[in-house]
Amino acid sequence: MSLVYMNIMIAFSISLLGLLMYRSHLMSSLLCLEGMMLALFILSTIMILNIHFTLASMIPIILLVFAACEAAVGLSLLVMVSNTYGVDYVQNLNLLQC
């Protein structure tokens, strides 16, 4: 395993660890999810370029689309929770049910 792959895996692991440790605030969780998506995007791009698999060249773009959708939904949820309750605790998400 090359040093680049190892660094990307470490970045993904640190983001996952941050998501597990700082899950009380919604903003921290969203930042850790974005770090994980960025690591997956870079890893998939490098792997596709290294194996010269041109048919799979759309996979990183699709991953970026899903990451953008996840970020938009997460930020809108963050705005809704912070406007309603004044704080961005994840435990307040249970109170938003109809």
Curated annotation (Swiss-Prot):
Compartments in which it is found: Mitochondrion inner membrane
Any one GO molecular function term: NADH dehydrogenase (ubiquinone) activity
Topology of the protein relative to the lipid bilayer: Multi-pass membrane protein
Uppermost EC category: translocase
EC number: 7.1.1.2
InterPro entries recorded: NADH_UbQ_OxRdtase_chain4L/K, NUOK/Mnh_C1-like
Catalytic activity: a ubiquinone + NADH + 5 H(+)(in) = a ubiquinol + NAD(+) + 4 H(+)(out)
Chain ranges passing through the membrane: 1-21, 25-45, 67-87
GO CC annotations on file: mitochondrial inner membrane; respiratory chain complex I
Chief place of localization: mitochondrion
Keywords (A to Z) from UniProt: Electron transport, Membrane, Mitochondrion, Mitochondrion inner membrane, NAD, Respiratory chain, Translocase, Transmembrane, Transmembrane helix, Transport, Ubiquinone
Pfam family, one: Oxidored_q2
One of the protein's GO biological processes: ATP synthesis coupled electron transport
Membership in a protein family: Belongs to the complex I subunit 4L family.
Biological function: Core subunit of the mitochondrial membrane respiratory chain NADH dehydrogenase (Complex I) which catalyzes electron transfer from NADH through the respiratory chain, using ubiquinone as an electron acceptor. Part of the enzyme membrane arm which is embedded in the lipid bilayer and involved in proton translocation.
Assembly with partners or alone: Core subunit of respiratory chain NADH dehydrogenase (Complex I) which is composed of 45 different subunits.
This protein's name: NADH-ubiquinone oxidoreductase chain 4L
Species per Swiss-Prot/TrEMBL record: Talpa europaea
Lineage, highest ranks first: Eukaryota, Metazoa, Chordata, Craniata, Vertebrata
